[in-house]
């Protein structure tokens, strides 16, 4: 019975549902709109690695811009200044940036990346949804060694504050989680 509970919890975590959410009584959903997300955001986060012995935790600086597109979608650009390589006492700073344009999908409040990609050839498949848990952007790719990689960025807002939760699962194993807070600098 315990094994079954662990397996169910893991499967729910893989699709982004906590066991508390399944067991909790329904609460009225806070109405959020994509308009609330449009703008420039900046903040910090802490990354926790399940696989990196030299950097089990590390700090990151985050910049995020979300702008409305003229076709009912949006453009999201984020940059992360990571400190998780080199000497743990003096880590190297590595800037990683990503920009993805999303267009409406068939289901309301869902979007898919405008660019058509093939995850079998190293392309990253992106999709997004807006629901009671916030703006969730997910990605999937197949690494060069054939192992699947699934990433989820969950962004929740309250006024000018944003909470970020990120998870990276490779070949069924949690590699890294990131939690952070951002402030809205300006609306777009």
Spans of model-derived segments:
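Bacterial N-terminal signal peptides
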Residues: 6-17
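Central antiparallel beta-sheet cores of small beta-barrel/beta-sandwich binding domains
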Residues: 45-143, 148-150, 185-188
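Positively charged n-region of N-terminal signal peptides that target proteins for export
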Residues: 1-5
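N-terminal helix-cap/turn-to-beta initiation motif at the start of protein domains
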Residues: 25-42
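Sec/Tat signal peptide C-region and signal peptidase I cleavage site
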Residues: 19-23
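One face of beta-strands
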Residues: 39-45, 60-62, 162-164, 178
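Edge beta-strand at a domain terminus
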Residues: 24-26, 149-188
């Amino acid at each position: 019975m315990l094994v079954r509970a662990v397996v169910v919890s893991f499967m729910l975590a893989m699709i982004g549902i906590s066991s508390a959410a399944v067991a909790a009584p329904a609460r009225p959903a806070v109405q959020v709109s994509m308009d609330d997300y449009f703008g420039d955001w900046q903040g910090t986060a802490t990354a926790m690695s399940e696989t990196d012995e030299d950097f089990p935790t590390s700090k990151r600086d985050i910049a995020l811009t979300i702008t409305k597109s003229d076709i009912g979608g949006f453009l999201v650009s984020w940059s992360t200044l990571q400190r998780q390589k080199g000497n743990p006492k003096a880590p190297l700073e590595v800037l990683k940036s990503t920009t993805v344009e999303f267009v409406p999908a068939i289901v309301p409040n869902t979007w898919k990346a405008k660019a058509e990609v093939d995850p079998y050839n190293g392309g990253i498949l992106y999709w997004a949804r807006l629901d009671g848990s916030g703006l969730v952007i997910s990605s999937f790719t197949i690494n060069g060694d054939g192992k699947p990689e699934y990433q989820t960025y969950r962004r929740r807002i309250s006024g000018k504050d944003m909470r970020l939760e990120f998870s990276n699962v490779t070949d069924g194993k949690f590699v890294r989680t990131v939690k952070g807070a951002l402030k809205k600098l300006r609306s777009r």
